[in-house]
Each structure stands twice: as structure tokens, then as C-alpha cells.
Amino acid sequence: MKGRFNEFGGQYVPETVMNALIELEDAYNKVIDDKEFMDEYMYYLNYYTGRPSPLYYAENMTKDLGGAKIYLKREDLNHTGAHKINNALGQVLLAKRMGKKKVIAETGAGQHGVATATVAAKFGLECKIFMGEEDIKRQAMNVKKMELLGAEVVPVLNGVRTLNDAVTEAIRYWASNVEDTYYVLGTAAGPHPYPTMVRNFQRVIGDEARKQILELEGRLPDYILAPVGGGSNAIGIFYPFIHDEEVNLIGVEAAGKGIETGEHAATITKKEKGILHGMLSYVLQDNDGGVLEAYSISAGLDYPGVGPEHAYLAETNRAEYESITDEEAVRDGFMYLTRIEGIVPALESSHAVAYAKKLAQTLSSDKIIIVNISGRGDKDMDAVLAYLGEK
């Protein structure tokens, strides 16, 4: 069924948004098979973003853990410092093709906001970024960067003032400005066609990783690990391997202060179905079906839902989803990788690194793990120092 992954996905939106989604899907279906559009997209990915990103053998980490061979997919080396630009670039080119003059986006950690503002600056489009007031405090450097790029950062004061509320506000704004405005949704969630569209703009990660590991090792990996908030970097690296049953796909969610505390963002771990931002997926909710606040030290993971394709992969057991606490992410992810490889990962990516550290030690040396380093950690220095200061 269109826009569905089994029962997950769909378009649970008011009529005003429905018309915009129909227009968007129509435009997207035209460009995805349009050689000129895809060539332009690949040109900017290669020469503006700096793709392909390397698949790096983490020799020190591998030796230190004494188990599986670990490779890092270096999305942190992209222009703007994360995987987000792969999608922002594709969608802004689509907005341009549709004749839209303005783009809007939501952002949590600020990486998607920076990526959207960057590409909007490049193509001369007006840009408005919706960001929860709480995240504005946590990510001051990214806010300044967006403003420097010419974007207007709109503080969202509703709810708990984080990513969830920013998405709600962006959709609301889009519904009443649809004639000249394009909404660049930052993750593989929301109503159809966004989950499919974002995945297809992020699959370049997995397409490259597949080619690279075959060149380096002559075979596919045994495990692929990626952090999961909304889930776009993870679905991007997973998708080209979905039909390779021998490759274990593991998404790593944020366990925050511990699942038992209720202060976490482990949506799939909790496995409760609900409707959020126009999609049916797993959603953190209370006994009355109200959406709960998600929590993580990582501003990019504290989303109370997850992309519908991840819900589908979890339900069909094609992928498994684990969770890592703030403490593990900081010490066994962020600090560990920085010290041992000289690579500072984003706090989001640090969750996957920390799980890789656990997993690698249980495997033999003939096994191969690829970890998606979805972004770099410069933006997280303040959060990590504050966390360590509190300890």
C-alpha cells in the first residue's frame, strides 16, 4: 500500500496539509527518475558535500577490544559535519524544481537546521528554522551558524520546547504557507512521502558503504550499527543491505538515564503504537495515549517517535534495536573514540560507538562491524563538559 510499511506510515493529517503532500509526492515521483535532477544531486553531493565519505578501519579500537574488526562510516566528514546534508540537498533541489521561494525546517541538535540553511544559502532561498527553546540553549553555536547563513531561527515555546514541538510548529506553519513554502523534514518520519523520500536521499551512505566494504574486505559486513532518533542516518545505511539476510542491522536508541527511570528516548524498545506527526509508528506515550516527553543527553535523539520503516524492520525482526544510556554514550562512545582514534563523534553517533564497543568484545576476529558515525562532536563539547562536571 502506498506510503505504508505493513501497517506503519500513512498520512494522518488535516486536509490543508493533505493537498501539500499530494503536490510534494507528485513532484518527487517526477524527479526520482529524472536523470538531469539526479545528476545534479550527485554533482553537489560529490563536489559540495565532499562525498563519498570514507569507510575507515578503526585499527586502534579493533586492537584494544580484541574482537571483531571495526570500520567507521565517516559521515562526520561531510560539509556541515553530519549526514543531514545528504537529505537537505536533495529536498532543497526539489523545492527549487517546484518553484518554491522559501524553505522551512525543524531542528533538534541544530545539524539539520544548519544543513538546510547552508543549502538554502547556496541556492538563494529564504529559510526559516523552527527550534525548541530548550534546544536553542543546548546548541547555541549551531543557532549562531544558522543566523550567519541567513536563516531566521524561530524559537518554539510550546510543550517541552524540544524537537517534537519544533516539528509540530513547522507543520502548522507549512499548512498555512504552502503556496510559496517547502517543508524540508529532517528525518525519515512524518507523513508519506517523507519517510520514503528522506530514506532515498540518505541511502547514498549505505550504497557507498556496500561498495567500500566489498573493495576492502571482499565481502559484506556481519553487523551494521547506527544511532536511531527519528532514524534517517540508520535507514540510509541499512536500506541497501535489507535483502542481505546475513548482515545484522542494529539500531541504537537513547536509554537516557535508564529505561526504568522513564527518562529516555527508546521508542522501539518500548514498542507502543501510536500516531505522531502524520504517521502511524511506535510512539512514547502514557496510559491515555498522550505523547510523552523523550529525554536524551543527545539533542538529536530525544524524539518520542521513530520513522515507520524502522518500526516495520523491528516488527518483522529484520533489524534489532538496542539502547545505550547517557553515561555509556559519554564514556564508552564520545570519550573512548576521541582518545583511541582521535575522532570526536557526535553524541548521537556515540550511542552506536558505545554499543559497538560492547558487541565487538563478544565476537571473534573474523567478524566485521560497520558503525555509522552520523556526525562530528564539536557541537556537543558543552553538553559533555557539563555532564562530566555534574558527575
From Swiss-Prot:
One of its GO terms (cellular component) is cytoplasm. One of its GO terms (molecular function) is tryptophan synthase activity. It is an enzyme of class 4 (lyase). Keywords: Amino-acid biosynthesis, Aromatic amino acid biosynthesis, Lyase, Pyridoxal phosphate, Tryptophan biosynthesis. Disulfide bonds: none annotated. Its EC number is 4.2.1.20. Signal peptide: none annotated. Its cofactor is pyridoxal 5'-phosphate. Pfam families: PALP (PF00291). Pathway: Amino-acid biosynthesis; L-tryptophan biosynthesis; L-tryptophan from chorismate: step 5/5. It catalyses: (1S,2R)-1-C-(indol-3-yl)glycerol 3-phosphate + L-serine = D-glyceraldehyde 3-phosphate + L-tryptophan + H2O. SUPFAM superfamilies: Tryptophan synthase beta subunit-like PLP-dependent enzymes. The modification N6-(pyridoxal phosphate)lysine is found at residue 84. The beta subunit is responsible for the synthesis of L-tryptophan from indole and L-serine. Tetramer of two alpha and two beta chains. Belongs to the TrpB family. This is Tryptophan synthase beta chain. The gene is trpB.
